[in-house]
Each structure stands twice: as structure tokens, then as C-alpha cells.
Amino acid sequence: MSKVSFIGGGSFGTALAILLAEKGNTVSIYNRDKKVVDDININRRNDKYIKNLQVPSNIKAFDNLEKATEDAEYIVLAIPSHTIRSICKQLKNKIKQETIIISIAKGIEEHTDKRLSLVIKEELNNPIVVLSGPSHAEEVVLKLPTTLVVSSENMNAASEAQNLFMTSFFRVYTNEDLVGVEVGGAVKNIIALAAGILDGLGYGDNTKAALMTRGMKEISRIGSALGGKEETFYGLTGMGDLIVTCTSNHSRNRKAGLLIGSGMDVNKAIEKIGMVVEGVKACKAFYELKEKIGVSMPITDILYKVLFEKKDPKSGIEELMLREKKSEIF
């Protein structure tokens, strides 16, 4: 059995920590919030992020990063995309070189437009694995069948991570296309936010089906331009993740969009969700990136205007519908 440290004690990080603890691993969780740490250690709960959950006794929480990661064989980065670099800087020279870093964050770094595995690589000289795919913490803790993907430049490390997480209800595939896996997981949050806005505006299944299908095209278009393989975008980390995030009541991106579509101010909607809405950051980052490299992403264009230029969401949908006529396949 292994020693695994989770950085971040949010809902999905906690769900995965419980999965690994129940497999017999020694698991630690780092969280800056002393109340979360005490809730885990004393009450064996984490009510701030996921209620009615029993945390196993072989999980220990810390508010000290160095103690939480001491002698860890695996470190799971279960934190928002914008905090990845700062955490990795803190880990530098404090962890073993053979420790495998597993990122479950989805997004790209603002201002640099770098995929998160590249951000980690710039700060740490460790094997890096990305775990991604269609999954919500609420279903993982109920042991409902879930299937994800691990990817890495080091496929031996990916295979280790696959073995670490694999259970009878949690199936993990490997995929060598790291670019495709990361881009699919990041861009689908943009489309999910837009899907929520459609729901908030009262549009129907026809409209959402069109949005998701054309959203898949945007994922494929930007992903291919960045070096990803098209078949990856139609797999678990692209289409699979898009479906679950656009349709599930567990999806915080969809829920934020629902509030915005219902008339709530963007910042108030994010505040009401109470957790990071990665689609907002991803929309800004990918809007800037596609402008630089010349990739067409009309849904991202409209969502950017809604989020950052106060465009009326309904007029944004009309603008999409009135775009120049063209063939579906291009």
C-alpha cells in the first residue's frame, strides 16, 4: 500500500481520498482552512464541501503543507487551476524526486495560456500524471460506476496511477495524448457554463443538443490546433466529460450558468456557488488564446461577452443563431 497526499480538501479530492483510503492506503489531506482540517480529524466529516460523508480513520488532515506531504509516494493536486503554480513552488525541494504528481485540476494558466501539466513541469522535476474524465464527487462516494483516464509524458507513471485508483466501480484507462486530455477537460467547462445559461433562459433540449454538438467542435478545433488528437476529444475526457458537465445537477459550471441565465449578476452567481467555477477562468484564458492563434470558437466568443462585457445572454444566443450560413462539416 502507498502513502498518498491530497493538496486541497474539496469535494472531488475528498471523494478520491476516501476511495484510496478504503483500498488500504495511508492518506493525508492538506487544506488551509483549520475548520475543514478539524472537521476531518475530529468529526470524520467534511461538511463544507460534501455533506453526510464518513471519512475513514486512515485519512489525516493537516493545515501544514510540509507535514501533509512528508514521505508521500503520490501527491494529488486537487486544487483550482490558478493555484497550481504557487503550490508547486512551495513543494519544490521538499518532496522526493520520485514522488508522482497527479493533477485532477482542469483549466489552463491565465496570462501564460499554459496547460497545467506544463506549469507543474516548470516548477517540479517529478513524474506528472493527469487524471480526467466524466465524474462528480457525489457519485464517486456512492460507489456508482465511474470511468476516467490517466495521461502523462511518462506512461510508466500513468500506469502506476491507473493501478492506484482502479477499483470494481472506478475504472481508469490510459491515454498517451496528454494535450488532448487536458484541453478537453478545460474547454468543456466553457460549454457547460453556456449550457447552464440556456437552462436559465428556459430554452429546450433542441437548443442544448445544438450547443453541446457545436461545443464539441470547438473543443476539437482548439485542441487539434494545440497538438491534441481528434479521437481523444470524442472519448471520455472530451465528449464524456462534456455530457456529464452540461447535463448534471452536480455540475457547478452548469449551476453557475443557470443562475446567470436566470438574470443573476455574474459575480453574484459565482459567489452563490461558493466554490471555484473553472468555466469562467477557462473562458477568459481560451478566448485570449484563440485570438492569438486564430481559431474560430463562436460559443466561447459569446460567453466571453456575457461574462466580461455584460452582454445580454438572450441576445447572445440570437447572435449565434444568426451567424453566416455554412456547412455543418468544415
UniProtKB/Swiss-Prot annotation:
Cellular component, GO annotation: cytosol
Record: active site: 188 (proton acceptor)
Main location: cytoplasm
Record pathway: Membrane lipid metabolism; glycerophospholipid metabolism
Biological process terms in GO annotation: carbohydrate metabolic process; glycerol-3-phosphate biosynthetic process; glycerol-3-phosphate catabolic process; glycerophospholipid metabolic process; phospholipid biosynthetic process
EC number: 1.1.1.94
Pfam family, one: NAD_Gly3P_dh_N
Domain of life, source organism: Bacteria
Membrane-crossing residue ranges in chain numbering: none
Binding site residues for NADPH: 11-12, 32, 106, 137, 252, 276, 278
Gene3D superfamilies for this protein: N-(1-d-carboxylethyl)-l-norvaline Dehydrogenase, domain 2 (1.10.1040.10), NAD(P)-binding Rossmann-like Domain (3.40.50.720)
InterPro entries, A to Z: 6-PGluconate_DH-like_C_sf (IPR008927), 6PGD_dom2 (IPR013328), G3P_DH_NAD-dep (IPR006168), G3P_DH_NAD-dep_C (IPR006109), G3P_DH_NAD-dep_N (IPR011128), NAD(P)-bd_dom_sf (IPR036291)
GO molecular function: glycerol-3-phosphate dehydrogenase [NAD(P)+] activity; NAD binding
Catalytic reaction annotation: sn-glycerol 3-phosphate + NAD(+) = dihydroxyacetone phosphate + NADH + H(+); sn-glycerol 3-phosphate + NADP(+) = dihydroxyacetone phosphate + NADPH + H(+)
PANTHER family assigned to the protein according to its UniProt record, in alphabetical order: GLYCEROL-3-PHOSPHATE DEHYDROGENASE, GLYCEROL-3-PHOSPHATE DEHYDROGENASE [NAD(+)] 2, CHLOROPLASTIC
Family affiliation: Belongs to the NAD-dependent glycerol-3-phosphate dehydrogenase family.
HAMAP family: NAD_Glyc3P_dehydrog (MF_00394)
Name this protein carries in UniProt: Glycerol-3-phosphate dehydrogenase [NAD(P)+]
Organism: Clostridium botulinum (strain Alaska E43 / Type E3)
